[in-house]
Amino acid sequence: VRHTLFETPSARGLTDAEMAAPLPRVRAVLFDFSNTIFEMINLETWLHRVGTASGRLALLDGHDAVAEISRQLRTAFRLPAVVALQEGRDLSPERHYRAMLGWWEHVDFLRGVEETAYRELTAPDAWGPYPDTEPTLRALRDRGLRIAIVSDFAWDLRIHLAHHKLDGLVDSCVISYEHGREKPDPQLFFTACADLGTDPRAALMVGDNPVRDGGAAACGLRTYILPAGSHSADRGLADILRLVT
């Protein structure tokens, strides 16, 4: 048995043979969803959809209307009561709905039309892929790799994949609300690997959150964390292809 003074935190105990063996080639890639391969439509587009559906579109005509709503959203999101509501919000649709309503009730434009706003948030076309999402998924597929999504999300994100005809490129979706767990809970990563029939040491986790997505490292996965991305620009996903060669 190999002993060490400083143990590396691990959710998966490795045998001595595994510790001594070289890392296997990457056979599967696990992706976070939000802000990794998909992003929500921009704020102005979402507000216009809410305004159209609720009869409040005229309220957005002012020169600084969107900027003021954005300011109120940021201010409200820092309120202690709103912060508390966000804790565990992706564990169930009900908790997420309450978290959003508790936030939006502090915003003049959204107060009273929160249900409409939520419907527009969760619409199939309210989330879209980055320009390099599909090419990267297809390139991984062409190399014979299995693909999963592991996401903290409070509704079925498969509707967004299907809307953009990308569902056929993903083998498994492990979504927090369906398991009653949020990342970095090890069980989510282990479940995805099991779904793909892949040893965690032969899997790569790609995300944008060092804590939540980086938690995959404690499960034996290699992990790649993307920097904060700009909207409507390549996400930098092509770099992943170099990691799986």
Where are these regions (language model features)?
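Asp-based, Mg2+/Mn2+-dependent phosphohydrolase catalytic module
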Residues: 1-31, 40, 109-112, 134, ...
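N-terminal helical cap/lid subdomain that shapes the substrate entry/recognition surface
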Residues: 2-134, 143
